[in-house]
Amino acid sequence: MGKIVKKQELVRTGIDALDLVGRAGEVLTYVFYDIDNDKIRNRVASICKDYGLERIQFSGFIGYLSRNRREELAVKLRDAISSSTGKILIQPVCEKDFRQYREFINVEEGEE
């Protein structure tokens, strides 16, 4: 494994960080999960993708959803983990707060 080099510059900020364009009535929504079972974890990721969410971490997605779509998603995700232990967080975020978004990344030397 290569040497970890901490990048000092800000990698992505605010709305420019993700190519997301919301429509009327839609709110940025984070989905994060912690699920032990690989099959169920993959199913949860697939459901998030089906709802047009973009993966931002191994177990995290973001995208614009209406209130109804968020509720539908919540039901599907709840049902998906019903036979396993796990935890799912669905968090709407207003644009004003999302503009405060900051992301820093450490990379291995030579991966830039």
Give the positions of each predicted feature:
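Basic nucleic-acid-binding interfaces
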Residues: M1-Y30, I35-E112
